[in-house]
Amino acid sequence: MITPQEALTRCIEHREIFHDEMLHLMRQIMQGQISPVMAAAILTGLRVKKETIGEISAAAQVMREFANKVPVADRENFVDIVGTGGDGSHTFNISTASMFVAAAAGAKIAKHGNRGVSSKSGSADVLEALGVNIMLTPEQVGQCIEETGIGFMFAPTHHPAMKNVAPIRKEMGVRTIFNILGPLTNPADAPNILMGVFHPDLVGIQVRVMQRLGAKHAIVVYGKDGMDEVSLGAATLVGELKDGEVREYEIHPEDFGLQMISNRGLKVADATESKEMLLEALTNVPGTPREIVSLNAGTALYAANVADSVEDGIRRAREAIASGAAQEKLDQFVRATQQFK
């Protein structure tokens, strides 16, 4: 089996670390069996040579092995809405707002998230600001999914082995393979996913990684204005896995009868501002927040196979917002999480 030194040499020579070797290497890193210096060197080497689909798939497989799983009985219309973050756009939590709308329209959501690292407000930060208890056990998350159709999995609770890697990542302070592994390692094993990424190259890579990991319907998006969401301010690159086949294409707001609007008005300074904008969208206040949430929730409903198309999904999302069902879903979710305090 490959040694850490051999793995580093491969990276320096821009050669691939093969699947079984990567499994072995990642298990060692996750268990703290490789020194911090060597682990940091390998993570840097992988980034410089550019991680391959095979390397990312193997690394994600190991993270899933080490995760505390969430028990879910009914997996139909079950979807994760997640972003890699790191897009530098500092917008409000669009995917978190979209989760309540999609759930109100019939999807089941298993959202996997954390506190903000590069963003002003991570999904965990805004959910806490809304009154959600994020410190649930895997069993309690499963119960929330049963009761409300939504589960939020706070990453540190579900990935305890990351404690061996966290200090290394923090000291390095640069992007590593772990930045793209989070969205691939849903502890509830959601078979469908809407994933936003921070770089156009990742669209084709991540959708093919999801294919290798056995996803059913995966939609990976990158807004050409730099957003890790479906954008209103520019075209969005899409990688879609459906029925075992991968397609890559572009979508535009106008395709769905939406006006192209700059995302500048979506920027926030902290979790409190993000909460206010999220509530605007859910309570049907006309404006860009409501429009971008309708677009992303609609795409999530298509990914969850609740809607036949993104257009159909947007229509369902708008209905969920206008009827008050999305706001009620948020209130229901807050109550469900608070019962475990």
UniProtKB/Swiss-Prot annotation:
Detail which positions bind 5-phospho-alpha-D-ribose 1-diphosphate: 83, 86-87, 91, 93-96, 111-119, 123
Residue runs in coiled coils: none
Matching InterPro entries:
Anthranilate_Pribosyl_Tfrase, Glycosyl_Trfase_fam3, Glycosyl_Trfase_fam3_N_dom, Glycosyl_Trfase_fam3_N_dom_sf, Nuc_phospho_transferase
Q: Which GO terms describe its biological process?
A: L-tryptophan biosynthetic process
The prosthetic group or cofactor this protein requires is: Mg(2+)
Query: What remark does the entry make about the cofactor?
Result: Binds 2 magnesium ions per monomer.
Q: Which Gene3D superfamilies does the entry link to?
A: Nucleoside phosphorylase/phosphoribosyltransferase catalytic domain (3.40.1030.10), Transferase, Pyrimidine Nucleoside Phosphorylase, Chain C (1.20.970.10)
GO CC, alphabetical: cytosol
Chain residues that bind anthranilate 2? 169
The pathway noted for it is: Amino-acid biosynthesis; L-tryptophan biosynthesis; L-tryptophan from chorismate: step 2/5
The organism's superkingdom is given as Bacteria
Molecular-function GO terms, alphabetical: anthranilate phosphoribosyltransferase activity; magnesium ion binding
Reactions that this protein is recorded to catalyse: N-(5-phospho-beta-D-ribosyl)anthranilate + diphosphate = 5-phospho-alpha-D-ribose 1-diphosphate + anthranilate
Name this polypeptide is given = Anthranilate phosphoribosyltransferase
Origin organism is Cupriavidus necator (strain ATCC 17699 / DSM 428 / KCTC 22496 / NCIMB 10442 / H16 / Stanier 337) (Ralstonia eutropha)
Q: Which gene encodes it?
A: trpD
